[in-house]
Every structure is written in C-alpha cells, then in structure tokens.
Amino acid sequence: MTVVLGALQAYRDIRPIVDRPDSFLRGDYLVLSKRVSALNAIGLGSGGFTSEELQELRSQPFVREVGALTPADYRITGSVGMGGVNLSTYLFFESVPDRFLDVEAADWDYEPSSRDIPIIIPRNYVNLYNYGFAPSQGLPQISEGIFRRVSLGIDIAGNGLTEHFRGRIVGLSNRLNTILVPDAFIRWSNGRFGQGGEKQASRVIVETDRPVDAAISAYLDGKGYEAEGDRRDSGKAAYFLQLAAGGLGG
C-alpha cells in the first residue's frame, strides 16, 4: 500500500513537469541533417531530404514523428538598437510544424502581408549576448523578460523586391537552435521573395522514445545523417527517476 500511495504521489508531483511543452519526460528530439560532401561544398550536390527519404525515416521503429524545417529562400537583414549601439547582421529564418515547438508563445500566427513577424529564438542566444557580446562591448546585460520585448528591424530582399518588417521575439526555445517564424510566414514570404519551386528541407526534427538506442546511431551512420541535438535532458530524466525510485524504495 505504501508503494502504491508513493507512486500516486510521485505521479501528481511530476504531472506538471510532464505537461510542460519543454519537458524532458515527453520524449527526446533530434535535429538531423546530411553530412556535407565535397560535391555539396562546390555546389554540385543536394543537401536536402527528398520525400522518399522522409517517408523512410518515418517508417523507422524508433521514430514517433518527423517534421521538416522549412528554410527561407531570400536574403534577410536584421537590425536592433541596444544601449545606444545599433547592431545589424544577416539572418536566417526557418519554420517547423507547431507540434514540435517547446514554447507556448502568444500570438504565434501570421496574416499574409502583415508587417509584424513573431519570432522564437534559441535561449542560448540570450546567454551568448549576456556573457559574450555585452561584456566585450561594454553593454549592459539584459533579462529574458526584456529580451522578449526587443523589437527587430527586418529587411527582406529577393525576387526584385525589398520590404521592411518588424520582428517581435515572442519566445525562447531550448530545443531548436534556429530562428523560427510561423510556417504561414515562411510559405507566404517564399512565394513573394523566393526563387520559386519547392525547396527540400535541409534539416528535419525527429521525435523518438529511444534516444540512446544503438539502432539509431547505426541507421544515421548508414544513411550519412548527422544529429545536431545534444542529450542533456536524458541525464536529467535518469537522475529524476533514480530519485523517485529511491524514494519509493525507502
């Protein structure tokens, strides 16, 4: 009876953690890309995933879901003012199906032709700014809350057009190391500024319930795929479960 009651209490305690979109107990995610070959380096090979390759990946026993990261097909320049310093750089945008997001972002939608673009950035960008760029430039560190209120100037050029937009940071991601915009924006903007034609996904995100399965490594090596994600959360999950087991056993 003690074990049963302990298990019920443990379930109640971890339920809020499991239900969070960035929970380490909701499966593991790998971002896959193809190894860059000599042909890719000189522009003679394709680094994208074909529809047949995506279908084969979905059929693997260790795969729950597969989502393609869709890249922007045009040039992007971003600018922002911080501490009296104006910063400008080239950017890249990608989109991913909403079910793969680990952020509950308000206003994560886009109406075609709107000048406002909601953006999700990697959380480590905040750390890079606070502990790398800011000290070297004599700029103040900023909190995540302030970071979310930063407004970016976005200039998009392509297909003979140049237009200005405003980027709003609406969330910070622990899962995806890319600058994310809504899928609706990528599709609309690629149609307006892109070169035309369907672009193959150069990266895909895979949800798996067996992140340390040797079959995954063997499959990736055999196909020439590389996994970009780390597995820090696997260690956290193992530690948590050890504590839970120890508590119930006692």
Where are these regions (language model features)?
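Short, strongly hydrophobic transmembrane alpha-helices
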Residues: 1-15
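A structural signal for short, well-ordered beta-strand segments and their strand-loop junctions
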Residues: 65-69, 120, 229
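Basic-flanked hydrophobic alpha-helices used for secretion and membrane insertion
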Residues: 76-78, 104, 111-112, 117-226
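Peri-transmembrane interface segments
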Residues: 210-250
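Membrane-proximal extracellular/periplasmic loop immediately following the first transmembrane helix
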Residues: 15-92
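Short hydrophobic beta-strand that contains or immediately precedes a catalytic carboxylate
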Residues: 90-93, 119-121
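Alpha-helical transmembrane helix bundles of large polytopic membrane transport and channel proteins
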Residues: 81-85, 90, 100-113
